[in-house]
Amino acid sequence: MAGIPSTSAPPKSSPTASPNPFAAPRTSPGSVGGQPSYLVPLSVLTTLFFMWGGLTSLNDVLIPHLKGIFALSYARAMAVQLTFFGTYGVMSIPAGSFVKKIGFKKGIIVGLAGAALGCLMFYPAATAQSFWLFMPALFVLATGIVILQVAANPFVAVLGRPETASSRLTLTQAFNSLATWAFPTFIGPIILAVAGLSAAELAKLTPEARHAQEASAVQLPYVGLALALGLLSLIVWRSKLPKIDTDSADGTNSANLLPDRGSAWKYRHLVWGAVGIFMYVGAEVAIGSLLVNYFKEPYILGLAEDKGSKLMAKYWLCAMIGRFVGSLFTLRKFNPGKVLAAHAVIASLLVVTSVLTTGWTAVLTIVAVGLLNSIMFPTIFTLAIDGLGRHTEQGSGILCAAIIGGAAIPFLQGLFADAAGLHISFILPAVCYVYIAWYGLKGHAVDARAKAAS
């Protein structure tokens, strides 16, 4: 999925010009020929986007795995997403203050260390065979990722020419999407394969011993991820990342600057945009969280969990493809609001089609939703902060907090699935997309229309 936007809005990129997105501004100190390259620090930052995208996507593997081990209802299984994305709502504002105090580079290192600690906490949770012990591990992991995102995003926004900032952000988020496909594809089957035991070996185990084997399947992958995060923190520590001043990039250069109303909360297009972020993240996460169980249903494909994990990864692969296409073509050629509305309408229709069908038709239509999700986050974000001027920082914080939709909507769908069935529960994401379509068509322009009429 997409990372949290920086607390300072990137200027819009020109729809016609395509300068090197990695070149620094001409006024940058130490420039050679007016255009030094920030390729090395941007490569390091892109690796961070890749890692937190992958770690987040593994929740979609954990949910069916833990649901099977502990015989959980859908609602209880969604405690994974409730804990993980609930952390965004709790920790985003404190993380921003923390990073502002210690600096962005140190913030990145602390975020990586926190995420590594969270991964290591999976080991004792699995040893104890306690579902609820996984929740503190997820909270610590998510806290590390929140700090990481708050610290890393401003670098991407300012390392290069202002007119190509959105291009850099979208391309960097594409690598985040790449990880959301790669991790479930290559790490997911390791977790879901019951520690590599054959069916004959599993048959010889008592239920208690089998549960122990299943729980231990998460230990090695997450310890490996902790080591990778630790290594990455050392690389960042040794890297010479330039110092940046976000106070000089507050978005006040917007051509559509609106009258100052004293607070970001007084701009309706921002508040409704936050609802859009809530709906988008909630719908995307809810669908991804339940796909493995969905593919397991006999009226869909009846797939085993390890095979379902590989198919689920295609949902995130579609998001990656769509993000590359959107950043390089769609959003450069067409009105962003109309593009957002079209994507949301088609996504809603695809979900409804999946609900009304079975077999491969249901599978292909729900997986294709990932393609439509691809441009929603950056487009909603850009439309929502447009014209806020000096309130852009506050507006960005409001949008970040709205990511808690990734906790609320999946939990509600879990309750719906328990009460009415998994198949019909996907109607909830379809409703979310209807709201996003309205925002793309009408909601984002409400304050601009009021300004024009005054």
Language-model features and meaning:
Residues 79-97, 313-326, 405:
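Central cavity-lining transmembrane alpha-helices of secondary-active solute carriers
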Residues 147-161, 374-389:
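Intracellular juxtamembrane helix-capping segments at the cytosolic ends
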Residues 2-48, 52, 262:
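Cytosolic juxtamembrane N-terminal segment immediately preceding the first transmembrane helix
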Residues 91-104, 322-335, 417:
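Helix-to-loop junctions at the C-terminal end of transmembrane segments
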Residues 40-67, 152-153, 287-295:
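Extracytoplasmic
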Residues 113-128, 345-358:
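C-terminal ends and interior cores of transmembrane alpha-helices
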Residues 59-63, 184-192, 263-313:
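Extracytoplasmic gate region of multi-pass secondary transporters
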